[in-house]
Amino acid sequence: MAKILVTKYENQADATVCEVAYESQADLCWYETPYEQQAQGDAKWLFVDYEGQASFKIFKVKYEGQADIKAFQVKYPEQARWRNAAHKFVGKMG
């Protein structure tokens, strides 16, 4: 399950993430789910408030060059997937 905590400081995060404007720019297309049971794999995210609940911690950055993962939020869960299957974080978030 991808239970995501957005950290306040970069050194607390497992990875830095930049939200990109277009799907074609993304390493990962992600979908935000409201239910824990639906937060499966790396691409379906449930945001949590506490570190103890999180399976993966991210720090949001402004520029693509600063990011470990370039991410694009999709509207439907079927669209959520890694666009770059060889990315070093594949299988590590959930």
Name each model feature, range by range.
Residues 1-94:
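Repetitive, compositionally biased segments used for assembly/scaffolding
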